[in-house]
């Protein structure tokens, strides 16, 4: 306790400094642009590079934000990221190839790649535009598309194997097609002389905005001849590539009678890395234990994992949805309204049929009948095959459910077109799976290899299954070119069209800028849009200027000119801008691309936020970054041009920083 000490004519007060007042939180920059993954349009604060990479992914040669974030976070501890994704989606044609010996099962699908003149509109499946030569077999067939013929094979040892002729990368610029889906197990199951068929199809529609990925409905055991749809799990990240990054495991399923002090059953839920053939495949990222469906319990599923998510309208207004804060870094619970008043005996025992990632019409030619996409199948559905590891031995840690090592099943982990249906896919239930004789090591109560699993008769360590994610979508055509560096043009920077205020890319960036425009909600002191250039993307940069001036508490580092701009052009490009909240720099600089490992030219805004962060760390905030200590560009190999004193003076006088 503070003590007051008194002496003649002098009064002093001793202050106890054991408890210091809480300081003001760090305020950092905001970066807007595309990233590999992460929540779209939701301003998200990261405090170190590891956190950034967990949420938004690592370096990507097509995007600038990851590089800029890495440089910035070396010198600062707070950074707000606003990821942009596509709006409106796309539609295009699909070539579907099947094999007759497998019941006309679909063997592969092809779509227009970046190499097509117009990937969104290339007609590849109309009358006469795609055809097969007569007599084509699995070993050798010829596909002709718009007058160009390709010698192909579904024999993986052939030099003409389909993925050796066509890439599976939609960004392939060398051919007009890429392999969208490749069902290798179906191909391997066909005979070498089985004939190849082709299906004509109309546009396949993905005409909607970006989406997160979701599991099929997790379903209960069979009660009165019916299964109850319980809940879904959704990813916090949006985008197409999130479908294949993770899978959900559900394990330790116990009936209520085996849970002391509860009228409800319980289970555990895991977030698992999905990366077949790699060292990290199967790594458990998160494990939530002893979950239940009792709304009054601290272990209530949505309460433990969380169900909150944020939506944003075209004006950038953010709306928070859900009741329980997210405790997971990867997922949230959704679609769980059926848990209200649920029968206490119900527990998760399977999931609904996965949806088909194609909705093409499959009337085939080159053979009889119609094609069908391969059907989902599940582990343990034949006698004594439950819980086998990759070596074929019993392993109590192995899951039932979808076989993620089956390459055909990996094709399910994809965006879902409009009106997607289950097709021939079927539901999965542990009650349709067999145990294993070696499960006797678990104790006296277990299910052997000749009997089906049950909630009452099986050991809880036998009751576990894994579930796929589907439906994550970038909101744009994956084959659209992603131009960077000196290739940036008005209608394409990193895959976004910013050529006018109404262009879809401009709408995405404007929505992201609006999201951080409220100073009462988001504290920032710096804004950068790496790769957005005022001279060719003025609809976006002018909007950013308006919002940053309205905030009046942050600074906008803006790229004024393209790589090719002369000094006079750089001056002319920004001469109408007179703002105390905007800075532009000249010229472009060369850095080392960490992904490609070679030098590349980038606009100044890619590197300058890191310089500002270093300046604020060793100098004073709001002091101009200058001199050898505070203005050094340590990551820059060279500038496009070495400026003379007179040229620097000319730039300074016209409000351009050299």
Regions found by a protein language model. Name each.
Residues 1-658:
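Subunit-assembly interface segments of extracellular/virion macromolecular structures
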């Amino acid at each position: 306790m503070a003590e007051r000490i008194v002496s003649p004519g002098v009064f002093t007060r001793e202050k106890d400094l054991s408890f210091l007042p809480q300081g003001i939180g760090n305020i950092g920059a905001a970066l807007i642009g595309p990233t590999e993954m992460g929540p779209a349009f939701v301003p998200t604060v990261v405090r170190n590079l590891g956190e950034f990479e967990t949420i938004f992914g690592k370096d990507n040669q097509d995007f600038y934000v990851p590089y800029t974030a890495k440089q910035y976070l070396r010198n600062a501890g707070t950074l707000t990221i606003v990821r942009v994704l596509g709006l409106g989606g796309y539609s295009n044609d699909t070539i579907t190839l099947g094999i007759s010996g497998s019941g006309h099962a679909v063997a592969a699908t092809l779509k227009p790649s970046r190499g097509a003149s117009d990937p969104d509109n290339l007609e590849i499946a109309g009358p006469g535009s795609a055809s097969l030569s007569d007599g084509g077999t699995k070993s050798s067939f010829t596909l002709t598309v718009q007058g160009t013929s390709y010698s192909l094979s579904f024999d993986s040892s052939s030099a003409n194997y389909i993925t050796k002729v066509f890439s599976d990368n939609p960004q392939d610029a060398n051919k007009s097609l890429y392999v969208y889906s490749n069902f290798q197990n179906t191909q391997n199951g066909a005979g070498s002389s089985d004939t190849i068929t082709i299906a004509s199809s109309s546009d396949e529609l993905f005409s909607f905005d970006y989406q997160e990925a979701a599991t099929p409905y997790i379903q209960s055991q069979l009660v009165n001849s019916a299964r109850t749809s319980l809940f879904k799990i959704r990813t916090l990240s949006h985008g197409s590539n999130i479908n294949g990054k993770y899978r959900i495991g559900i394990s330790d399923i116990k009936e209520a009678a085996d849970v002391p002090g509860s009228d409800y059953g319980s289970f555990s839920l895991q977030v698992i890395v999905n990366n077949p053939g790699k060292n990290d495949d199967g790594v458990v990222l998160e494990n939530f234990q002893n979950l239940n469906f009792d709304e009054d319990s601290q272990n209530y599923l949505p309460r433990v994992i969380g169900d909150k998510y944020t939506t944003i309208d075209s004006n950038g207004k953010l709306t928070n949805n859900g009741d329980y804060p997210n405790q997971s870094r990867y997922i949230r619970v959704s679609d769980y309204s059926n848990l209200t008043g649920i029968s206490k005996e119900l527990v998760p025992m399977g999931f609904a049929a996965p949806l088909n990632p194609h909705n093409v019409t499959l009337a085939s030619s080159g053979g009889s009948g119609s094609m069908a996409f391969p059907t989902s199948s599940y582990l343990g559905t034949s006698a004594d095959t439950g819980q086998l590891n990759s070596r074929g031995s019993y392993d109590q840690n192995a899951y039932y459910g979808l076989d993620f090592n089956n390459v055909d099943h990996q094709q399910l982990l994809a965006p879902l077109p409009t009106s997607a249906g289950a097709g021939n896919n079927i539901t999965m239930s542990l009650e349709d799976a067999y145990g294993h004789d070696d499960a006797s090591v678990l104790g006296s109560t277990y299910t052997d290899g000749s009997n089906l699993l049950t909630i009452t008769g099986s050991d809880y360590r036998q009751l576990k299954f894994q579930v796929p994610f589907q439906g994550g979508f970038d909101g744009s055509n994956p084959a659209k070119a992603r131009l960077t560096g000196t290739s940036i043009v008005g209608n394409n920077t990193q895959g976004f069209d910013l050529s006018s205020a109404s262009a879809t890319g401009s709408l995405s960036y404007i929505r992201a800028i609006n999201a951080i425009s409220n100073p009462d909600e988001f504290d920032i002191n710096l804004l950068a849009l790496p790769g957005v250039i005022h001279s060719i993307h003025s609809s976006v940069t002018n909007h950013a200027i308006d919002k940053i001036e309205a905030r009046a508490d942050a600074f906008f580092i803006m790229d004024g000119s393209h790589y090719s701009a002369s000094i006079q052009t750089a001056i002319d490009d920004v001469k109408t801008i007179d703002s105390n909240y905007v800075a532009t720099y000249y010229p472009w600089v060369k850095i080392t691309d960490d992904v490609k490992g070679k030098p590349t030219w980038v606009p100044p805004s890619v590197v300058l936020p890191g310089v500002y962060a270093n300046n604020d760390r060793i100098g004073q905030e709001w002091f101009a970054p200058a001199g050898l200590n505070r203005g050094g560009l340590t990551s820059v190999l060279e500038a496009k041009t070495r400026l003379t004193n007179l040229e620097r003076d000319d730039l300074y006088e016209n409000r351009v920083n050299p």
